[in-house]
């Protein structure tokens, strides 16, 4: 009877140890996925920001060019 009890404890222990390793791996995988999601959100936000800055710079450049053209025409006339 004692041999059977020891065998059952050994089987239970050997079953629980790999289970805990699997849970740790799963948690690490979930953490990596969360980090990947955060990084992709940051990249998208940065892309949107750069797009907005680019259009603002283009608008300002166009306004400066128009003003410069007017100054040149006034100086010639």
Curated annotation (Swiss-Prot):
Main location: secreted
Protein keywords: Amidation, Amphibian defense peptide, Antibiotic, Antimicrobial, Cleavage on pair of basic residues, Immunity, Innate immunity, Membrane, Secreted, Signal, Target cell membrane, Target membrane
Keyword Secreted: yes
Signal peptide: 1-22
InterPro entries linked to this entry: Frog_antimicrobial_propeptide (IPR004275), FSAP (IPR016322)
Propeptide: 23-44
Modified residues (Glutamine amide): 76
Primary role: Antimicrobial peptide with potent activity against Gram-positive bacteria B.megaterium, C.glutamicum and S.aureus and mollicutes A.laidlawii and S.melliferum. Less active against Gram-negative bacteria B.cepacia, P.aeruginosa, S.typhimurium and S.meliloti. Probably acts by disturbing membrane functions with its amphipathic structure.
Protein name (database record): Dermatoxin-S1
Highest classification ranks of the organism: Eukaryota, Metazoa, Chordata, Craniata, Vertebrata
Gene encoding the protein: DRT-S
